[in-house]
Amino acid sequence: MGVENDGEPPFSQHAQLKKATEGTESLYTILMSHNPTHWRREVLPKTDIDLMLAGHTHAMQVTLFGRSLSEFLYPEWKGLYTEGTQVLYVNIGIGYVGMPFRFGAWPEITVLTLKNSVQ
């Protein structure tokens, strides 16, 4: 399922998470939400969504030795994060914001393979 952008101000907060999750209680749920701050602020405390996919950070288009200034704004800025049974994946994307420039934060396309643990 997907929701409208829901980020920290000045970004909009228009996600209708409750409406989006209606009727999904017994299903494995995957949420697409643009901003990773939505996970800690709304998804973790209010839902049992299994996997959230986010982007937004672009790793601020620069990483050095695996670190980025985006860490200061986004606790979850790149990669896989787990909290209990809930998982967040943040993709740093392929584009840019502002200047058409990337250094170390090379464009990323992610392929996730989901497997049923019950065989």
Task: Please give the residue ranges for each predicted region.
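Soluble catalytic domains of enzymes that build or remodel membrane lipids, polysaccharides, and related
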Residues: 1-119
